[in-house]
Amino acid sequence: MATDAQMAQVAELEVEMMSDMYRRMTNSCQAKCIATAFRESELTKGEAVCLDRCVAKYLDVHEKLGKRLTSMSQGDEAALQKIAQQ
């Protein structure tokens, strides 16, 4: 059973990973969608649409990777349990 310290460490790692993903997504989508020479104080419609699509794709890929890694991890755990039973 996981201790409170272990649970706190897991929660801290999750926050760190989400912060890193947000930072990378922000940097990537801003570089892709927003010109470096600002001509207007507000986002143009094209920039807003580009950012929306970029963020949606980034989150979709992040979710798919998370599901895939979870299924791989569960498969590894099952294999280890089989080996331990032998």
Curated annotation (Swiss-Prot):
UniProt main location, coarse: mitochondrion
Membrane topology: Peripheral membrane protein
Keywords carried by this UniProt record: Chaperone, Disulfide bond, Membrane, Metal-binding, Mitochondrion, Mitochondrion inner membrane, Protein transport, Translocation, Transport, Zinc
Disulfide bonds, paired cysteine numbers: C29-C54, C33-C50
TM segment ranges: none
Example GO molecular function: metal ion binding
Record has Methyltransferase as a keyword: no
Record note on disruption phenotype: Worms a small body size, reduced number of progeny produced and partial embryonic lethality due to defects in import of proteins into mitochondria.
Entries under InterPro entries matching the protein: Tim10-like, Tim10-like_dom_sf
GO process annotations (BP): protein insertion into mitochondrial inner membrane; regulation of multicellular organism growth
Chain span(s) of sequence motif Twin CX3C motif: 29-54
An example Gene Ontology CC term for this record: mitochondrial inner membrane
Family, per entry: Belongs to the small Tim family.
Self-association and partners: Heterohexamer; composed of 3 copies of tim-9/tin-9.1 and 3 copies of tim-10/tin-10, named soluble 70 kDa complex. The complex associates with the tim-22 component of the TIM22 complex. Interacts with multi-pass transmembrane proteins in transit.
UniProt domain comment: The twin CX3C motif contains 4 conserved Cys residues that form 2 disulfide bonds in the mitochondrial intermembrane space. However, during the transit of tim-10/tin-10 from cytoplasm into mitochondrion, the Cys residues probably coordinate zinc, thereby preventing folding and allowing its transfer across mitochondrial outer membrane.
Descriptive protein name: Mitochondrial import inner membrane translocase subunit Tim10
Annotated source species: Caenorhabditis elegans
Gene: tin-10
